[in-house]
Amino acid sequence: MRFDKSKEIFDNTKRYIPGGVNSPVRAFKNLSITPPVISKGKGCRIFDIDGNEYIDFVLSWGAMILGHCDPDVVNSIKEVVEDQIAFGAPTEIEYKMAKLVCETAQVDMVRFVNSGTEATMTAIRLAKGYTGKKKIVKFAGCYHGHHDIFLKEAGSAVAELRLKGIDEDIVQNTIVVEYNNLDSIEKAFKENKDEISAVIIEPVAGNMGVVPAKKEFLQALREICDLHGSLLIFDEVITGFRLSLKGARALYNVEPDLVTFGKIIGGGLPCGAVGGKKEIMQCLAPQGNVFQAGTMSGNPIVMSAGYATIKKLKENPDIYTYLELLAQKLEGNLAKVFSSSNLTFCINRVGSMLTVFFGVEKVENFEMAKKSNLSMFKKFAEYMITNGIYIPSSQFEAMFLSSAHTESDIERFAEVAEGFAKFVKKP
């Protein structure tokens, strides 16, 4: 593949946008290839300005569960865009969207915001306001957005950066413990008795690569939070509406007090939300005295796209069955390819999201993820992308499937992966 036009545009963009991107992971900093500048997406395929075609397994970092430019989502936007863009005032589609989200995700109430970061920020403020406590517990490798309170030992692109500009006075109230380690969470509560407002966790981590929480671990978190009067927050920005209509909660049968949403909930447009128990949600202004606001929150275009997406998922539950079958096939094909090539690897998969780790046989937390062969993953990402399979450039991100993918797309992924295995095995 040639990336001449992409390189030219990307280099020119750096004159006006720091690093040439509006989110660090897009810059391919850890790869030796230029990030393709994308011009079009349709179904499970994207195209760059050099004319290269890719089967997309990034899908706007999981947001495009129906594939790019799904006709129903596109039509929903067209239906409102000539009359409704933004008012900063109530609209009927907000009501319809809120009702649909509450019914499908099974939360009492919901507040829409503009991003996953805003959703988690709001959830934490709500937890502090409701409990009257200042400290929070998060887990190493879990990424909850770019606010100061969350960037302590975070995953995603943060894992590869040395950060400055973080307010230490804020961060000192963030306690970081090890994912899937019950002793570490018990120690945190013992050392910070009656000070912890909330525990926030990705029930399936997607930003240290895919790493699922153990069911008994989440059940223990629920019990510990109840014992100490702390809230349990599930960050389902990635997993919400991806693993099921009820997200990861349906898999674990553990109910948090609050849950955050993003990505899929906006149908590919900027949207986040926090939902949860009525008695807690009612603390938000103007009903309560925990403040949150946003000029563009719940705007008609985003609400329409999100409504069309969730409505389609609700009316077609077989989509989740189809995604599971495709993901099983992809996992199985990759395991066969890497095993036959005598590569040491681990594939972590939950539903339609997965990560390949090289050089290790098990990954259950961030420390284990960091011990994987990062240089091998770099080679893997470069090889796959330059051969038309668009995957994350970072080890600490997830691959995703959409309902637009087919079995032939999965087979093509395995074929290219087999080429990679032969490539790295060359003497």
From Swiss-Prot:
CDD domains: OAT_like. Its cofactor is pyridoxal 5'-phosphate. One of its GO terms (biological process) is protoporphyrinogen IX biosynthetic process. It comes from the Bacteria. One of its GO terms (cellular component) is cytoplasm. Keywords: Cytoplasm, Isomerase, Porphyrin biosynthesis, Pyridoxal phosphate. Its EC number is 5.4.3.8. It is found in: Cytoplasm. One of its GO terms (molecular function) is glutamate-1-semialdehyde 2,1-aminomutase activity. InterPro entries: 4pyrrol_synth_GluAld_NH2Trfase, Aminotrans_3, Aminotrans_3_PPA_site, PyrdxlP-dep_Trfase, PyrdxlP-dep_Trfase_major, PyrdxlP-dep_Trfase_small. This is Glutamate-1-semialdehyde 2,1-aminomutase. It comes from Caldicellulosiruptor saccharolyticus (strain ATCC 43494 / DSM 8903 / Tp8T 6331). The lineage of its organism: Bacteria, Bacillati, Bacillota, Bacillota incertae sedis, Caldicellulosiruptorales.
